[in-house]
Amino acid sequence: MHSEDQKMLEYDTFTEAYVDLIKRVYQRPEHVCSPRGMKIHEYLGVTFKICDARNRLPYVPERNFSIAYFIGESLWYLSGNNSTEWISRYSSFWKNISDDGSTANSAYGSRIFKPHDRIAATVDNTWTQWKYVIDELINDQDSRRVVIHIRSPQDSLLAKKDVPCTLTLQFFLRQDRVHQTVCM
């Protein structure tokens, strides 16, 4: 971002953050580049806070926002499903970016709510990253280790079209409130 913008940005709502950041990146991009032939504008290292986390649905009349798709995608993530068949009822986007036509590599829910293969095989077949978040916050309310890993090393090698842009979700329990930091 430009030097005057190098601070923590604060917004009351998700919509306010979304609209302001879209305007900033299009009107004053820090970088313009073309990964995989797609021209993009970008800022690196943007940090912002949404003060009213309950007001988290984007309301931007100019944008084609489908509440049915939003609900469907949320349920898909929460179910731990990464099959494109189910979510494609709401949008063909997922089948179009799938590397194998049937699996969405970037379906966060599968990575968060399903048992991790390597850990399940060696330690605990019920262990999930979400279970770890809950257990760790209960056992150590001051923990800084409560991290969900979304992107894995295999994504860099195996996935070609569908790679998660989110790297980690980190949770903190402070003053009886859960705070989340997302690294993308």
Model-predicted regions and their roles:
Residues 1-184:
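Terminal, non-catalytic protein-protein interaction segments that mediate quaternary/complex assembly
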